[in-house]
Amino acid sequence: MSSSNYDVKTGNFLCGFDKFPPEKETDKNRGLTEGFTEIISMAGVPGTIEIASGYYIEASLINQLIQIIGVDVFIKSYFFNLGTKFLESKLLNIIADPELAFQLFRNIEINFQIRNLKGKQSLLGNIQLLLLDYLEKRCEKLIENNKLREVNEILKIYEQMLITPEKLKIMDKNPDDYEGLVESITKFKNLQEKLSPKLVNIEAQDSVRK
């Protein structure tokens, strides 16, 4: 754990998305804590080679989530030790399924716990696939409100944050062990193709503003 503080009143140790001892499942998520701590660290040290980070996968998943619910939500949850409940509430505004949001964060935590596991595994691929469901709904809502440029920027950034087989090779991991990962990349490309006809009016919007 990269940092922590002790709450004298409650007798709990607090750190990012974690509370010790935890009272409920949403009180603990070391995967999120380490991932967001890594993002903060890399932001503070320009030139850091991100893919060399020990928590690159966790940071990448969080960066995907940031494009969906915003960085301010993470900052508040992290520094005020809110667990994952606040994050879940924001996801419910996109897809109204509490179990889906809960399971997403459980999977991120479990994926962190088994990060050194060798052999076939499907959690990482499933997480990226699920995040893309949220991304699609988020983009559709923005398009409904004619926020085309915002959607365009989100898709550009999101593509850079995807965990790909090529990145896993650089991390000395076998991409063939990560079931569902290739499918998640394909799903993102299909989403790009689906939304691209709706984004052709961005230049027209800019002309109107001028």
Could you describe each region identified by the protein language model?
Residues 6, 10-69:
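Post-HExxH zinc-binding segment in Zn-dependent metallohydrolases
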Residues 1-5:
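Short alpha-helix carrying the canonical HExxH Zn2+-binding catalytic motif
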Residues 52-207:
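Pan-zinc metallopeptidase signature
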